[in-house]
């Protein structure tokens, strides 16, 4: 499984509530993104990085996911079959929330990710349902390379996205056809990659939490 670090587009720490309260159509429009960047409301991290998302429900249940991007074509067959079913549509400028997937727990990766959580989080807030949301940035070269090496050993993932992967695959097909028709397609375009939230599992099926829309975004189209 080749899950990569990426240059994330995310809210400035003092504007996070403002960004999270925006409708998704507003967040994903090119004009709004550019205006928000110029105003310092949205930031784009200079170096490709991984992120950790921790969700603690009001009942104390805590789940943590690694956030990165993955080439759509490299996803395993069970995921690929589900994404092919969606109709094509126009490609948004941003993928504003990651597609949640699960993988078999890797103890060494657990240790690496736990170490990353020892630092101060980028964001730490509660939603109206009293769920706590925390995010850590992993940008140190040594940590990024260690995580990249470990996730390559994950043999497969299972789709828990409830349509996010299907939607992004449909957008990618449309954008790919347009680029091919224009003679500009290279295969390296951002729309060929999907933002994933990878949750470890020990085999038992568990409902996956949803990250608030706009926390971490992957730019999939030119602005």
Give names to the regions the model predicted.
Residues 1-223:
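Surface-exposed, charge/polar-rich loops and edge strands
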């Amino acid at each position: 499984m080749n899950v990569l670090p990426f240059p994330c587009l995310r809210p400035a720490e003092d504007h996070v509530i403002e960004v999270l309260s925006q409708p998704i159509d507003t967040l994903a429009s090119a004009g709004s993104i550019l205006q928000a960047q110029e105003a310092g409301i949205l930031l784009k991290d200079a170096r490709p990085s991984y992120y950790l998302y921790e969700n603690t429900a009001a009942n104390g249940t805590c789940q943590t996911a690694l956030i990165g991007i993955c080439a759509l074509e490299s996803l395993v067959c069970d995921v690929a079959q589900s994404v092919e079913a969606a109709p094509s549509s126009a490609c948004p400028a941003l993928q504003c929330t990651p597609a949640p997937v699960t993988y078999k727990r890797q103890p060494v990766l657990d240790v690496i990710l736990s170490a990353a959580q020892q630092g101060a989080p980028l964001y730490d807030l509660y939603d109206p349902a009293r769920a706590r949301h925390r995010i850590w940035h992993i940008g140190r070269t040594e940590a990024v390379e260690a995580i990249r090496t470990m996730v390559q050993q994950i043999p497969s993932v299972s789709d828990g996205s409830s349509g996010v992967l299907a939607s992004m695959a449909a957008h990618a097909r449309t954008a790919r056809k347009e680029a091919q028709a224009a003679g500009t397609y290279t295969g390296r375009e951002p729309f060929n990659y999907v933002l994933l939230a990878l949750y470890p599992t020990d085999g038992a099926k568990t409902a996956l939490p949803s990250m608030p829309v706009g926390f971490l975004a992957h730019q999939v189209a030119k602005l």
